[in-house]
Amino acid sequence: MYLTIITLPLFAFLTVGVIGRKLGVRGSQIITSLSIIISAILSLYGFYEIVLLNNLGPITIYLSPWMNVIGAHADWAFYFDSISITMCVVVSSISSLVHLYSIGYMQGDPHIQRFFSYLSLFTFFMLLLVTGNNYLLMFVGWEGIGVSSYLLINFWFTRIQANKASMQAMLVNRVGDLGFVLGLFGIFWLFGSSDYDTVGIIAYKLDEQYITIVTLFLLIAAIGKSAQLGLHTWLPSAMEGPTPVSALIHAATLVTAGVYLILRSSPLFELAPTSLICVCVIGSLTAIFAATTGLFQNDLKRVIAYSTCSQLGYMVFALGLSQYEVAFFHLFNHAYFKALLFLSAGSIIHALHDEQDMRKMGGLVNILPFTYTMILIGSLSLMALPFLTGYYSKDAILEVAYGQFLVTGTFTYWLGTITATITAFYSSKALILGFFGTPNGSKKIYNTIHEAPLIMSIPLFLLSICSIFIGYITNKHLSVIGIGSSGIISGGVGTLRDHYLGFDIEFISTSFGVQFYPLFASLLGISLALIVLKDPKKMHSIEKPEGLLNTVNITRWLSSKSYWFDNVYNTVLISGSLHFGGIFARDIDKGFLSLLGPQGLQQLLITISRFFAIKIDTGFIPHYASIIIIIPIFIILSIFI
């Protein structure tokens, strides 16, 4: 049964990819959607057996040996524990809803079969990533989701921006993939195996410096795939793909692969304090950076993309604080309300005939009441307002950060609280600009606006239910947050005893403010948005600051330009690399090395040939006769002497 969870998406991809034209549009949609839905049902049953009943324990399914050489061993084997089966539930359930949603969203597209086959391929590789029992098998899934992401972002390949975005996503992630490869080599060198259990057992006997090097390489991989500060530039650009792709890949699954990698590598990171500090700092800086950047975005999907980047920062710095259960709790909750936000945005874009600029919207609350309700639920959950899904996990992260009583804990707590204010501000901004005020779009478009069809509305409704209740259910009835073995994933992570908080997060502090600062921060962000957006034009009038002392304008200007990361990469790294490559090719490759190699050898042979031609080809028969005698004598002497 457990292997069927993985193989069904592969079956759907192969079937539709090979005979999709014969099956037709409807047949391809039925096969892919039904396969993913069955996979989701089986994942839920596996979750019931492994997590709720808790009578099976981790399940390892061994297929065959893969590699068994000196110093390296790996098998084709799959590992189902509380972490992997929960990830299977997230991936398969959201993928099934995205498949259903895409039936309506992609209606009329001439390449529907190709789109659904790509979705199924991505789902297969993501399930392979989270269920493999070793790092090498995880790497196969890691590369597979990268290729699938490229294909889906570039699905509308006739659009230049889609071509650029897919290439950017692929190239930026190459940096992270290099980190994974180096970390994988380090794991094989240190442990002789890439199995999670083997690595976790032997790690405690190795020197800290070796573990630190390996974990830093794995951190680079996580930074690339989870769009953390420095390698984040691909995520907003990836919004050029179809909106269902954004919901599946860039909100709920692919971008969480880096978080999953650190979570699986917790026995290593726990033994490398330097790496944990790096994880903590990078995550907290990513959260505040992405939030401030999202403030001044006009594209609806880009706003949600930057919010994804910011929420991933929360998860990463929670991992850096060794609070793996809380980070995984937020990963689980975030997947559902962020998928709801993206699919709701897709309904708006679908209704407005592909318009994504919020400045050209407005007044949609009476025209699209169902869509407004859905995106409102998702936004409130993102703001972490009480009793919604995001409230339980996001506040838990901030509370455990405060409970560390360390510099890193205080640093992340206050940055996270400030980020909560900004998140509430830009979420409110998106709602106000899109649904309230005077319509700013074309009258022709507004006259044809309609609600999404039923096949698109059902996934939205189901995700809204999850965005309201799933946080409460998992928090109170599944004991996701717990000390020691009380959390449902505690058996899958390795946390040092010194890193346990020693008490539940509900009792971190008796101070009223500590537990309620995040809520006050969110309410402050909503209030500021209502005040500032009375005149929305001022919000978008970003000009270059005249003086360095005008810090407000500087912040607004830098945020609106995404802190110039793309410009720096293009002008310094790319242009500099191309310039250096040109100089190297001209002076070294075609210059010095060419003189030592082909051109120099050619010239030497020509010179020698001319010398002998002049000295030997004299036209005198005695000279030729002497050469005929000398050459055989020379050959005989060279053989026998």
Curated annotation (Swiss-Prot):
Record carries keyword Mitochondrion: yes
EC number: 7.1.1.2
Location in the cell: Mitochondrion inner membrane
Superkingdom of the organism of origin: Eukaryota
Membrane topology category: Multi-pass membrane protein
This protein's GO CC annotations: mitochondrial inner membrane
One GO BP: ATP synthesis coupled electron transport
GO molecular-function terms, A-Z: NADH dehydrogenase (ubiquinone) activity
Reactions catalysed according to its record: a ubiquinone + NADH + 5 H(+)(in) = a ubiquinol + NAD(+) + 4 H(+)(out)
UniProt xrefs under InterPro entries: NADH_DH_su5_C, NADHpl_OxRdtase_5_subgr, ND/Mrp_TM, NU5C-like, Proton_antipo_N
Keywords: Electron transport, Membrane, Mitochondrion, Mitochondrion inner membrane, NAD, Respiratory chain, Translocase, Transmembrane, Transmembrane helix, Transport, Ubiquinone
Predominant localisation class: mitochondrion
Protein known as: NADH-ubiquinone oxidoreductase chain 5
Species, as recorded: Allomyces macrogynus
Gene name of the encoded protein: ND5
